[in-house]
């Protein structure tokens, strides 16, 4: 049997797009005849604390859905402090080194990047002539950090760029979740083999029914990470609520700020539903009219996986993130676009949308696009041929 190792920083029972994406890849490879092993830290995201059932462990191994999962020790932290975040990544990197020394590593390895330091550890220490290293790039780091204002172009930034370029050079195959990511990598390493691997979901498509609502207001929903990059707190402050009510699901750095804002502004139609499981969320999402996908700043290379997830649910989107995601929404008629960072334009776009736009026919049409254009299994089979 073909053996393959996946090294990641996020994996269930952690929640979020990153954990779901890697779990889906692992399950897909297993179903296609691979013996899959996953290495991941002890679960701690998004709280920054090791989950209750894993506390006190240094290394915990389990077998789930025919996949072997090694969960390694990490200094868990979700602090904004850069030194604490660095310490977390260093601790996981040392745990990986310990694993590489004492355990046999297969000849096919998929490494998730970012985090850059974890990817560097893998690309440096696992580099062998007979081993195929596949680098799965979901964000262009440190460039994305520069766009978000996390980094300045200084000595530390140049070190991160060096690590980024090193990782690309050592990869036998690079997966990128967007055309922009692949273009950036090809500009740095033109001889590298690349493959466009979108974050397509793989769940049963729900059957949609006509909904009748007395409320004239549009039910707008956001579901996901409540982080700095998404800017949902600012969204709560800037939205014009004349024609909408705003529902929020998720957790992250901005959670408390959002809860406090709702508490201090009880007249605004903002409802925070907390963090829920993906299985619970999907049936809830199809009850809404429109989902918003925001990015506080345009991040080169970023295409939020929600875009593909919502299309499978038949849920129209209001895309507020710029870049390649805009082009996908336009090309496949998945919803509406507002200029990234321009809240006046966002409110103008919202004011021009009415309840009559959310017909069953339109929602089914969006699902059909997902079926024909965003198919996980079709993409996976093409990827397997590259292995």
Pin down the residues of each PLM region:
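Conserved donor-binding/catalytic core segment of Leloir-type glycosyltransferases
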Residues: 213-230, 236-247
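Nucleotide-activated donor-binding/catalytic signature segment of Leloir-type glycosyltransferases, i.e.
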Residues: 217, 245-250, 256-282
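Carbohydrate-associated surface elements
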Residues: 180, 197-200
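N-terminal subdomain of nucleotide-sugar transferases
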Residues: 1-65, 202, 237-240
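Membrane-proximal helix-turn-helix segments that form the acceptor-binding/catalytic region
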Residues: 94-97, 117-120, 124-128, 154-174
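A charged, aromatic-enriched C-terminal amphipathic alpha-helix characteristic of glycosyltransferases
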Residues: 341-347, 357-387
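Nucleotide-sugar donor phosphate/pyrophosphate-binding loop at the beta->alpha transition
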Residues: 132, 143-166, 203, 228
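Nucleotide-sugar-dependent
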Residues: 230, 277-284, 291-311, 317-328
């Amino acid at each position: 049997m073909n053996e393959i190792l996946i090294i990641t920083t996020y994996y269930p029972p952690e929640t979020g797009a990153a954990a779901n994406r890697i779990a889906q890849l692992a399950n897909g490879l297993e179903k296609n005849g691979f013996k899959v092993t996953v290495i991941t830290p002890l679960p701690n995201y998004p709280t920054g604390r090791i989950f209750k059932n894993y506390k006190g462990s240094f290394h915990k191994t389990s077998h789930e859905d025919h996949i072997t999962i090694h969960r390694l020790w990490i200094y868990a932290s979700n602090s904004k402090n850069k030194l604490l975040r660095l310490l977390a990544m260093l601790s996981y990197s040392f745990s990986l080194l310990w694993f590489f020394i004492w355990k046999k590593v297969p000849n096919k390895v998929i490494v998730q990047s970012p985090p850059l330091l974890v990817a560097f550890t893998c690309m440096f220490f696992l580099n062998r002539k007979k081993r195929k290293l596949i680098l799965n790039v979901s964000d262009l780091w440190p460039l994305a950090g520069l766009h978000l204002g996390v980094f300045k172009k200084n000595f530390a930034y140049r070190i991160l760029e060096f690590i980024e370029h090193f990782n690309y050079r050592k990869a036998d195959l690079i997966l990128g979740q967007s055309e922009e990511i692949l273009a950036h990598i090809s500009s740095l390493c033109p001889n590298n083999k690349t493959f466009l691997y979108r974050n397509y979901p793989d769940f049963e498509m729900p059957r949609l029914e006509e909904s009748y609502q007395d409320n004239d207001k549009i039910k707008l929903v956001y579901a996901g990470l409540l982080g700095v990059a998404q800017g949902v707190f600012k969204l709560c402050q800037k939205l014009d609520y004349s024609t909408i009510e705003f529902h929020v699901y998720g957790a992250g750095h901005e959670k408390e700020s959002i809860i406090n804002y709702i508490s201090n502004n009880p007249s605004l139609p903002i409802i925070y539903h907390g963090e829920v499981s993906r299985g619970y969320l999907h049936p809830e999402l199809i009850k809404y009219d429109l989902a918003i996908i925001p990015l506080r700043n345009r991040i080169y290379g970023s295409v939020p996986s929600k875009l593909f997830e919502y299309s499978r649910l038949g849920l129209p989107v209001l895309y507020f993130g710029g870049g390649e995601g805009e082009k996908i929404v336009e090309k496949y008629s998945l919803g509406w676009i507002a200029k990234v960072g321009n809240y006046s334009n966002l409110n103008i776009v919202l004011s021009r949308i009415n309840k009559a736009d959310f017909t069953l026919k339109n929602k089914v049409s969006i699902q059909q696009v997902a079926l024909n254009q965003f198919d996980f299994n079709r993409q996976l089979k093409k990827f397997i041929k590259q292995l």
